[in-house]
Amino acid sequence: VIELRGSHQRFPSSKLPNDHDIAPGQSISNGLFEEGLMTNQTQTHQVTLDFYTLNDLRTIAKTLPRLELHPDVITKIEAGAQFVLEKAAEDRYIYGTNTGFGSLCETRVENEEMEMLQFNHVVSHAVGVGEIVPESLSRLMMFIKLLTFRTGHTGISMAPVQRLIDMWNNDIMPAIPKKGTVGASGDLAPLAHMALPLLGLGKVYYQGEIVESAGVLDAMGWEPLRLKPKEGLALTNGVQYINARGAQCLMRIEEMMKTADLFAAMSSQAFSTSETFYQAPYHETTFHPERKTVATNMRKVL
């Protein structure tokens, strides 16, 4: 008998708890896509410069901790914002900062008009249509957007970033229409709708209802933000709506895979099949980790 041992190396484990395998008695959905859930005020997650995996996003979506920024993240954001302010003051054309957009890229915008330029950019792109996406999708999209600000490369200042964190921590989620992305060129409309509440415009999910953001800002004692150079562009550029939808699709697929493993185990027991095919030694002959995962899941529930 020749004993074969695989040398397959799994990807490095996430810094957050693994939630892929089935545990006896574990709920399949475990509240992952439930709506109207509130932030866990007893648990805090510090947003760092580390890479976030799908498993990290899943854990955040399930546990809904309060958010705060690591000091290193704050330093990078502040440095990036200062860099943009310095460049905007120079006598040179900087796209979307002291110039118009698209075909107006060579039209200079004066210093006193830069704030209005960013405001108009956000408002003019908030033209999404269709039904409002679920609150869970809006929340995940907003978290992924926060991750894009960590390096300071967008040039956004701390005020909009902190406002998004405050909205998360107080269960205030942007109400975002379903249709409006232009794909790889950017989720312009969805992200613009995400940014509207920062300006006291648009609507939000709040206390189980969709309401005008202006009233919520008044209730929280928050003033509408005034965008600095490039901040409207930083808020609307990106594919975080697509990212969030894709992440949720993958999470749902993995939940379906868990269900399939349960059905396979139930069928095996119902038909009194041999136990050999899901025992660990049998799967040491393969380099496919997915086979091992399915076999492990079946053993856990049998």
Residue locations for each model-derived region?
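Conserved, well-structured ligand/cofactor-binding cores
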Residues: 39-302
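Low-complexity, intrinsically disordered or signal/transmembrane-proximal segments
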Residues: 8-9, 20, 26
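Alpha-helix boundary/capping motif
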Residues: 19-21, 31
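Short linear motifs in low-complexity or flexible loops
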Residues: 14, 23-24
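Conserved catalytic Walker-motif region of ABC-type ATPase nucleotide-binding domains
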Residues: 4
